Amino acid sequence: MYQTTAALRSAFLEFFRSNGHQVVDSSSLVPGNDPTLLFTNAGMNQFKDVFLGMDKRSYTRATTAQRCVRAGGKHNDLDNVGYTARHHTFFEMLGNFSFGDYFKEDAIRFGWTFLTEVLKLPKERLCVTVYQTDDEAFEIWNKKIGVAAENIIRIGDNKGAPYASDNFWQMGDTGPCGPCTEIFYDHGDHIWGGRPGSPEEDGDRFIEIWNIVFMQYNRQASGEMLPLPKPSVDTGMGIERIAAIMQGVHSNYEIDIFRALIAKAAEIIGVTDLSNKSLRVIADHIRSCAFLVADGVMPSNEGRGYVLRRIIRRAVRHGNKLGATEAFFYKLVPTLIEVMGDAAKGLADTQVIVEKALKAEEEQFARTLERGLGILDSALNELQGDTLDGETVFKLYDTYGFPVDLTADVCRERNIIVDEAGFEAAMAEQRSRAQAAGNFGADYNAALKIDAETAFCGYSELTGNAKVTALYLNGESVPAINAGDDAVVVLDVTPFYAESGGQVGDKGVLVAQGIEFAVSDTQKFGQASGHKGTLTAGSLSVGQVLEAKVDKKLRHRTQLNHSVTHLLHAALRQVLGTHVTQKGSLVDPERLRFDFSHFEAVKPAELKQVEELVNTQIRRNHELKVAEMAIDEAKEKGAMALFGEKYDAQVRVVTMGDFSIELCGGTHVGRTGDIGLFKITSEGGIAAGVRRIEAVTGAAAMAYVAQQQAQLEEAAALLKGDTQSVVAKLKAQLDKMKQLEKDMQQLKDKLAAAASADLACDAVVVNGVNVLIKKLDGVEAGALRGLQDELKQKLKSAVILLGVAQEGKVNLIAGVSNDLVGKVKAGELVAMVAAQVGGKGGGRPDMAQAGGSQPENLDAALSQVLPWITERLA
């Protein structure tokens, strides 16, 4: 009964549903309401605001089977995964919660009843822990539940500070906290380990299966513990641990879910030893990677995306270690969906996208994996001592895409540690170089610290009077500036938009009688807006009143491009999938640039579909509606928020019909029809997993279309036709070119045949074998293959090496007749010569080609060929 993981999950949720709990779906692995969390790592994450009293639900009891990831950040199990019985990057946390409803006695009774009556675990196999001073919990266990006192273990402050204990939970330095009680299962005396609190507690005999937290205090900054008005309960039980117990196995990797994934991975790769730890790593990692992609995380070089990339690459490396020769990881997704059952619904809905994303990342890493592993292996073989230097670790990271933990994983297998401090130093040095390379001018934003606020009135007004509150010249605060000075002007209120969210700062003028300040840019300095520019007339002092005038034409063109990025974002998500998220943007009066997460190049047909979708929304002339609301309300309405952006409690929401809704502080058109026309000008990759679209709108789009039309007409004229016949005429020209190339090759072959007759006379005989070594002049590299074939036919039993030096390059070809490949291999011969002319190459035993970059060394290299061949023909 309840042998499978799926059955356990259902039994748990049904038990608590029947006891008045609301069954709540697992939340996303990407926390929606907690910027402090990288990933959802506990069942209580989605209820954090409820526990803090900031959110109220229609229920006071809840139960969940929450998907969790612990990799990266504070909670990071990645290094141990595969090497222990219970560490995972992904796990499911079964939990029940009380929000000011029941408390200690009911929480304890629910847990004990489920374990002993529903799952029928032997009571004698269970023991419990309580916080040292939690007499109430001790009494409940002992008097109400009937657990013998010797099986109730008090745990004190065992982590070096008051309330720092395995049995005292706290959300942070202040806020809700309280004691907890934990239930442990005894796997038997055949396994090493001691009871909780004993010196041997880290063994695997006694395993914690359920943690019940009693949130009863509100910790003050002073350390004082004040009682909460409504104590609550937060519990958690890892489904993998309880499944291992129910299935009679000791390791989590032996339960049904992992058995199926390990077997499938072994089948795909061709491995027979199912106990191999690398199979454990792969089976664990496919769970976290697949569900992260399903929840919208894409591999990238920052934040959550980089953690995902690290996990994928670790799995790929372990596959390589097992002998995988092609992409295998993504092929585990169907098996994962099958074994996860109801918990995989979201994954099943996004299966195609998940498989494509994993395959793309795996194939990309495969291009550098072998070479990187070769360099690492060489470094480890030459290592003196037990520490790999930080420079090598950095080179593997920077050049071959090896995350530090992947390098550490390889080193661990050889009892080598990595110099993480040296790696960090190399990283810091690279950042300094990059920063220095980017500092082409003064960085006002970094240099100026302005303790002032500027009110923004530019959503509705483009002109207005304002008082000068500060002036900065050469980074220093000054009371006045004079004509010709390049400065930063700070106003108390401004219609100028300061660069933010990808939208460039406004340009315009600040004027008064006899004074004109030309604003070339507007930037944020904390809460102040700084107007950068030049005082072109008069003198200006702090306290003066000016009229601020934004350049209306530039602002209007910028607004067109900003509004269309919202439409573009929504269109990309419709066409490519909801995994698409904005990674960056640039919106100026001339064009727009939009960076987004996607695992492959956008196909021409997809780009066309995106463009048509955006233009359809433009033609529908939606009114842009702007509203301010609480951020939680905005997210409930489906507003897109950007990861990494910091939002206030009140946010600005921009809606375009039923097509797009985003959080945005930028300026926009009144209706989508104002945009006029949208035209994509380019699409390409800028980083692994990140694509970029560049586009134009309005008059710029019309000009772009006109330019394209003009080029089409010019091409038609060159082809002596009209625009309708360009494609047909180009095809005809290409066919003609192919025929000419074919005719030319035939001529080259005839010339090669004629030349071979003369060259054959230059062959020398070595031990009865014709050997021809020749440097050729005036012969195209493309003709070498045909020439070599002709010579082999003429010379019969022969070894041939031909070289051509032209335009600073060397081309080599080696040919060996079939009767001689047992003694002389063309690939080895050509590789030997190529190494001496700055190149490399290879091929079959009977024919091989190579190139080089040092033609000046060709004669010397060829002089060594005859002795090399003679030695092998002896």
Swiss-Prot record:
SUPFAM superfamilies: Class II aaRS and biotin synthetases, Putative anticodon-binding domain of alanyl-tRNA synthetase (AlaRS), ThrRS/AlaRS common domain, Translation proteins. Its cofactor is Zn(2+). It catalyses: tRNA(Ala) + L-alanine + ATP = L-alanyl-tRNA(Ala) + AMP + diphosphate. Zn(2+) binds at residues 562, 566, 664, 668. The keyword Ligase applies. Gene3D superfamilies: 2.40.30.130, 3.10.310.40, 3.30.54.20, 6.10.250.550, Bira Bifunctional Protein, Domain 2, Threonyl-trna Synthetase, Chain A, domain 2. Keywords: Aminoacyl-tRNA synthetase, ATP-binding, Cytoplasm, Ligase, Metal-binding, Nucleotide-binding, Protein biosynthesis, RNA-binding, tRNA-binding, Zinc. Its EC number is 6.1.1.7. PROSITE patterns: AA_TRNA_LIGASE_II_ALA. Binds 1 zinc ion per subunit. CDD domains: AlaRS_core (cd00673). GO terms for cellular component: cytosol. It is an enzyme of class 6 (ligase). It comes from the Bacteria. One of its GO terms (molecular function) is aminoacyl-tRNA deacylase activity. It is found in: Cytoplasm. Pfam families: DHHA1 (PF02272), tRNA-synt_2c (PF01411), tRNA_SAD (PF07973). Belongs to the class-II aminoacyl-tRNA synthetase family. Consists of three domains; the N-terminal catalytic domain, the editing domain and the C-terminal C-Ala domain. The editing domain removes incorrectly charged amino acids, while the C-Ala domain, along with tRNA(Ala), serves as a bridge to cooperatively bring together the editing and aminoacylation centers thus stimulating deacylation of misacylated tRNAs. NCBIfam families: alaS (TIGR00344). Catalyzes the attachment of alanine to tRNA(Ala) in a two-step reaction: alanine is first activated by ATP to form Ala-AMP and then transferred to the acceptor end of tRNA(Ala). Also edits incorrectly charged Ser-tRNA(Ala) and Gly-tRNA(Ala) via its editing domain. This is Alanine--tRNA ligase.
